[in-house]
């Protein structure tokens, strides 16, 4: 074993070889007083035969190798996990890697944009999860020849994500930003395949591109009809369209596109169309049309006309174009009223004979030549007014107003202006609308309510989109009110979709 002095000399020699121009002297190296540098000593090999150092170096080497192997194994596991998550995400979002090309031809006769440009059309697979009050959901896939992956993993995701859903739940693709098509900055029609919660508060998002929604039932609109196949709980949506109107639509709409745009006017007010589109995106900050209602239109077209996904994509472009047209008309200050609703006389079968309406009619001259400004219809005591008000989400909410005690000489009027908007006013004895006064009516969500036990509504008028007069349930009060009216002038009044018709 070398001594300490020999080891120091060897190190000094090695240092001098590294920097021959500037010799470095170690602290423990003794330098002679002579001017000439000392002769270099011969390099000595360090041959350490100590087994303890070898074992120590070997253990360090083994530790480093094991650490590297562990890191490599973790990286491989992470890569496998990423691939698995990517496959699951593709399965959930029904992502297609080879989108087809379809021509967008022949817009709607009601004003949709016509173009012959080619557009990208991603036809997603739609997976419907049906849960009819059972413990385990039944997965039913709609026919899609472009994808054959099984949706079993999705069922577990749905079961864990939505523990409290009721009736039917639909899972469909909601496109991301890259799937939106930029026409005037706000097309993005792929989003109409998404489904949101219509009137419910239980919709949840599994991921960025998947939305869960509970389908509605017949109890939501007992007087309405089904969109789609009423015998297939996976392909139907309940709507507020009455049977007579649905028959009228089916009779007059001979093409799928015309029926889709007609249903759009029945289900969404033009004001809602003007501030909305299918995707809820765009430079104007528009809201999304209720996806459940759009899904109902889709089911109805598939059921009635047997359209394909490519046809549905083209129809969605026409729906977006119709919304843009309504937005432009609103920006220009033009009327948004649906003229066909005013020209069409609804069938008397829409309401039963027992639904006798009590009202004071306007003069006959007013019926023959309606004034351009407004039409007025007075309501009597104990009259019940049924209000269908459209919310911001495009859904029709049904409420009732029970006309209470109207002071002598005063009355409650329904006013329809030239734009088709309806209002309810409290009019005084001088014929002027009482500003800031209490409307002589109370609101109720129970159609069977007969008493006037609620608090009066504040304000001089109520803005509504649809109004129809419901049957009088309090016959005693109705008889008293009838004595004050002219018995020969009590025609049946039908107010439907913003247009008041007198028969």
From Swiss-Prot:
Name by which UniProt lists this protein: Protein BANP
Chain segments carrying region Disordered: 174-203, 335-371
Record's function text: Controls V(D)J recombination during T-cell development by repressing T-cell receptor (TCR) beta enhancer function. Binds to scaffold/matrix attachment region beta (S/MARbeta), an ATC-rich DNA sequence located upstream of the TCR beta enhancer. Represses cyclin D1 transcription by recruiting HDAC1 to its promoter, thereby diminishing H3K9ac, H3S10ph and H4K8ac levels. Promotes TP53 activation, which causes cell cycle arrest. Plays a role in the regulation of alternative splicing.
Compositionally biased region (Low complexity): 343-359
Location in the cell: Nucleus; Nucleus speckle; Cytoplasm
Modified residues (N6-acetyllysine): 283
Organism of derivation: Bos taurus
Comp. bias (Pro residues): 360-371
Keyword line: Acetylation, Cell cycle, Chromatin regulator, Coiled coil, Cytoplasm, Developmental protein, DNA-binding, Isopeptide bond, Nucleus, Phosphoprotein, Repressor, RNA-binding, Transcription, Transcription regulation, Ubl conjugation
Coiled coil ranges: 65-98
Sites of Phosphoserine modification: 19, 98, 108, 347
Stored InterPro entries: BANP, BEN_domain
GO molecular function, one term: DNA binding
Domain of life: Eukaryota
Modifications after synthesis and translation: MAPK1/MAPK3-mediated phosphorylation at Thr-345 and Thr-360 results in export to the cytoplasm.
GO biological process: chromatin organization
Annotated SMART domains: BEN
Covalent cross-link Glycyl lysine isopeptide (Lys-Gly) (interchain with G-Cter in SUMO2), where: 141
Primary location group: nucleus
Limits of the BEN domain: 234-330
Region called DNA-binding, residue ranges: 350-399
Record bears the keyword Repressor: yes
Region span, Interaction with CUX1 and HDAC1: 160-350
Family (UniProt): Belongs to the BANP/SMAR1 family.
């Amino acid at each position: 074993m070398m001594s300490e002095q020999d080891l120091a000399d060897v190190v000094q020699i090695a240092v001098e070889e590294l920097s021959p121009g500037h010799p470095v002297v170690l602290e423990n190296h003794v330098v002679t007083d002579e001017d000439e540098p000392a002769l270099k000593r011969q390099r000595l090999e360090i041959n350490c035969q100590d087994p303890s150092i070898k074992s120590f170096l070997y253990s360090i080497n083994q530790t480093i190798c094991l650490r590297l192997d562990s890191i490599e194994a973790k990286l491989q596991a992470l890569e496998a996990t990423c691939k698995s998550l990517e496959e699951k995400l593709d399965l959930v979002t029904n992502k297609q890697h080879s989108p087809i090309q379809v021509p967008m031809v022949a817009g709607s006769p009601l004003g949709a944009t016509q173009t012959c440009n080619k557009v990208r059309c991603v036809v997603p697979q739609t997976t419907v999860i049906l849960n009819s009050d059972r413990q385990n959901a039944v997965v039913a896939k709609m026919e899609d020849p472009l994808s054959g992956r099984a949706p079993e993993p999705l069922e577990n995701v749905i079961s864990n994500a939505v523990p409290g859903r009721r009736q039917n739940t639909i899972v469909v693709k909601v496109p991301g930003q890259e799937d939106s098509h930029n026409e005037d900055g706000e097309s993005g029609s792929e989003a109409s395949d998404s489904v949101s919660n219509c009137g419910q508060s239980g919709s949840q998002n599994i991921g960025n591109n998947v939305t869960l929604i509970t389908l509605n039932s017949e109890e939501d609109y007992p007087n309405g009809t089904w969109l789609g196949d009423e015998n297939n709980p996976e392909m139907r949506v309940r709507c507020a369209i009455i049977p007579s109107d649905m028959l009228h639509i089916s009779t007059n709409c001979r093409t799928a596109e015309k029926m889709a745009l007609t249903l759009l006017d029945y289900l969404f007010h033009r004001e809602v169309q003007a501030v909305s589109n299918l995707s809820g995106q765009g430079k104007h900050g528009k809201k999304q049309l209720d996806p459940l209602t759009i899904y109902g239109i889709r089911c109805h077209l598939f059921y009635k006309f047997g359209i394909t996904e490519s046809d549905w994509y083209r129809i969605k472009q026409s729906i977006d174009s119709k919304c843009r047209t309504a937005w432009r008309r609103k920006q220009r200050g033009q009327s948004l009223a649906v003229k066909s609703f005013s020209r069409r006389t609804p069938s008397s079968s829409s309401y039963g004979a027992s639904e006798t309406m009590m009202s004071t009619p306007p003069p006959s001259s007013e019926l023959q030549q309606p004034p351009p400004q407004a039409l007025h219809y007075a309501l009597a005591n104990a009259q019940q007014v049924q209000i269908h008000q459209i919310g911001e989400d495009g859904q029709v909410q049904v409420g009732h107003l029970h006309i209470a005690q109207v002071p002598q000489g005063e009355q409650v009027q329904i006013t329809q202006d030239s734009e088709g908007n309806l209002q309810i006013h409290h009019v005084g004895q001088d014929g002027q609308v009482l500003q800031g006064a209490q409307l002589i009516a109370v609101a109720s969500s129970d159609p069977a309510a007969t008493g006037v036990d609620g608090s009066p509504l504040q304000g001089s008028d109520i803005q509504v989109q649809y109004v129809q007069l419901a049957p009088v349930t309090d016959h005693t009060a109705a008889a008293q009110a009838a004595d004050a009216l002219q018995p020969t002038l009590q025609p049946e009044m039908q107010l439907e979709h913003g247009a008041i018709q007198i028969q």
